[in-house]
């Protein structure tokens, strides 16, 4: 008789995903970030749930309710610090996960990849509306600036912005609906994650060589279940260290000042994980052009499978393409730095060059280099 985990309708699904799943024997630590993202999502949902129990989404009390959570609620300070810094770790894991996918050619699983890009957009939207909730200065002005970008949409732009605001400015209606969205989206993300995994398990995991690994599989449990647990421990220790020792390291001091529509902060900027996209937005001196560049800076990931020209899947044996990949990583870091700088010389020109290079690498350099490597190897 088959064991219960193989015959029970529900346990069978868990078994096929977590126990008896055939996994390539050579997947490295770069394959840990998927499970770490799952851990981040669970952590954020749980801490967020407890924060929502004490938070009030009204402009008169939102800021003070967050102060109340930190001062009067049992371990409220800890829950808030884990939630705020958990978002940073979420994005660190996302960017490393995407980088892994780009480096090893995982994007050739097109359905899995495209659902992943949709997940990235959902997480970015969730983080944006969440940042508005404490109703500090940067919350308010960040919401004003980013929602205003929609006014660049031809013909319907202004109507669209007022519709999202629920009035003629960022006000109580805006905060209330942003809280509703921030509560809803993580569950949408959880559902999309299930779809992401369904598509992944259709094909199985890629591996560092990019070659077919059917001849060398190992069961997920115990090998990768324990490897994932080690990753969990590392992530939780790092998150606890940041949340306990320097919880405000990545935050903006302006957000300790309650929102004031009459005083604009000297430098409006988003959280660090959006700075690269913000730099691309600012590098184009035209509103609609900037908005399109901002959008395309993320959606360009969907074009990567189409622009893949190499006969090899992974970059493991492609030194020229490796150089371009690390150039892209350096470029994103430069954009992140520029996004946090004031709009003045030399930061403007550095941002424009880095933004051009970002798109040039994706759209021209990487495809041409892939084709060139085929030629060099005589693989016409």
Swiss-Prot record:
Binding site for heme b b566: 97, 196
Residues the entry annotates as binding a ubiquinone: 201
Compartments, as annotated in UniProt: Mitochondrion inner membrane
Named cofactor requirement(s): heme b
Transmembrane segments annotated in the record for this chain: 33-53, 77-98, 113-133, 178-198, 226-246, 288-308, 320-340, 347-367
Complexes and interactors: The cytochrome bc1 complex contains 3 respiratory subunits (MT-CYB, CYC1 and UQCRFS1), 2 core proteins (UQCRC1 and UQCRC2) and probably 6 low-molecular weight proteins.
GO cellular component: mitochondrial inner membrane; respiratory chain complex III
Keywords of this entry: Electron transport, Heme, Iron, Membrane, Metal-binding, Mitochondrion, Mitochondrion inner membrane, Respiratory chain, Transmembrane, Transmembrane helix, Transport, Ubiquinone
Protein name: Cytochrome b
Membrane topology: Multi-pass membrane protein
SUPFAM superfamilies referenced in this protein's UniProt entry, alphabetically: a domain/subunit of cytochrome bc1 complex (Ubiquinol-cytochrome c reductase) (SSF81648), Transmembrane di-heme cytochromes (SSF81342)
More details: Heme 1 (or BL or b562) is low-potential and absorbs at about 562 nm, and heme 2 (or BH or b566) is high-potential and absorbs at about 566 nm.
GO biological process, one term: mitochondrial electron transport, ubiquinol to cytochrome c
Residues that bind heme b b562: 83, 182
InterPro entries named in the record: Cyt_b/b6_C, Cyt_b/b6_C_sf, Cyt_b/b6_N, Cytb/b6-like_sf, Cytochrome_b, Cytochrome_b_C_euk/bac, Cytochrome_b_N_euk/bac, Di-haem_cyt_TM
